[in-house]
Amino acid sequence: MHVLNILWVVFGIGLMLVLNLKFKINSMVALLVAALSVGMLAGMDLMSLLHTMKAGFGNTLGELAIIVVFGAVIGKLMVDSGAAHQIAHTLLARLGLRYVQLSVIIIGLIFGLAMFYEVAFIMLAPLVIVIAAEAKIPFLKLAIPAVAAATTAHSLFPPQPGPVALVNAYGADMGMVYIYGVLVTIPSVICAGLILPKFLGNLERPTPSFLKADQPVDMNNLPSFGVSILVPLIPAIIMISTTIANIWLVKDTPAWEVVNFIGSSPIAMFIAMVVAFVLFGTARGHDMQWVMNAFESAVKSIAMVILIIGAGGVLKQTIIDTGIGDTIGMLMSHGNISPYIMAWLITVLIRLATGQGVVSAMTAAGIISAAILDPATGQLVGVNPALLVLATAAGSNTLTHINDASFWLFKGYFDLSVKDTLKTWGLLELVNSVVGLIIVLIISMVA
């Protein structure tokens, strides 16, 4: 019966795509119809299905909704105050277009390493859109390399939760994960961020409406470059500082609680938003009504994106509750292939099925560890644990689709169709993942 659930999941995903692409049904409605179909076909009783839907919607949006809203407000204030224009103009004037691409990759790597991915994306998106507008190039030509860098850093490197969990599961040396991770990251980002866009054809898309200034920007009253770049960096500064402070702080002490409260994603974003109220608003001579108008405009514009992300969470949770992850793991564990490829493949399949990066990685880690662990020594046999971490992490950073919140975040923020999102977000993640595995295999042969 569990094997049959794979068929129901495929049917549900196909149904959503048909409703959205052929019949032009709103993505939120199509996702909910797909979730209901999968749950009922998989034999879930109606009350369990109702609980799953509420859990999927609530758990997905619990923290993410706050992050998305605060990030959208910061982005709107950056545009309306001219801060985004100041950043774009300064970078292009000093670096030129060639090095601007490199700069957004570096910023993406830093944000992806320091923040949860959703926070990193929300901070990156308005920057790359305005820089691209200033350079008169399609914004996706900068968005793709920036996002490729952020997702790679987020997936491969501690202190992000997925890599940390894998390091613990495999007993890997964290220093070697960083060293090998750099070797994996560079070609992955080059291929997904710089080479892939050359093969994607026309990337020209209109600027998302909520990132257009409601009124002409006063070019004589722009924030300085330093102030303009400081605000989007505030969450990264706070979170990096928290990570460093935790090296010395004792867990559950008052000092630890205060630092980790401030360093949590919602609070760090809230602090950045309040600073934006001042530095992009009142400090530039705008009254509080001007600031609140920007706030309300951003919230209204991002509302549908949030609802669609929540509906995607419903489908994801419904799929997870069918037990499909365990089914895929059981089927794959009977193969006789390289542990690196096996770890990557199991993670990819479960990620595709469930939309859960950390869950897919940890499921693969459990299966692989059981297969190659020496019970006498407690050590993995015949593999490099650090490379196994990276192979599994690369599998979690792969092609995703309608059951993944990040898919809908990319689609909604950049105002793309489902088809265009699969072509851009989907392919950049797939290239990232495949190149990552290839580099891991090459290192395993020479290290």
Swiss-Prot record:
Keyword hit for Metal-binding: no
Periplasmic side: 22-28, 76-103, 148-175, 246-260, 316-329, 373-374
Membrane topology term: Multi-pass membrane protein
Molecular function in Gene Ontology: carbohydrate:proton symporter activity; gluconate transmembrane transporter activity
Metabolic or biological pathway, per its Swiss-Prot or TrEMBL entry: Carbohydrate acid metabolism; D-gluconate degradation
Keywords: Cell inner membrane, Cell membrane, Gluconate utilization, Membrane, Sugar transport, Transmembrane, Transmembrane helix, Transport
Transmembrane segments: 1-21, 29-49, 55-75, 104-124, 127-147, 176-196, 225-245, 261-281, 295-315, 330-350, 352-372, 375-395, 427-447
GO CC term (a single one): membrane
Protein's GO biological process: D-gluconate metabolic process; gluconate transmembrane transport
Cross-referenced InterPro entries: Glcn_transporter
Protein family (similarity comment): Belongs to the GntP permease family.
Name listed for the protein in its UniProt record: High-affinity gluconate transporter
Source organism of this protein record: Escherichia coli (strain K12)
GN (gene name): gntP
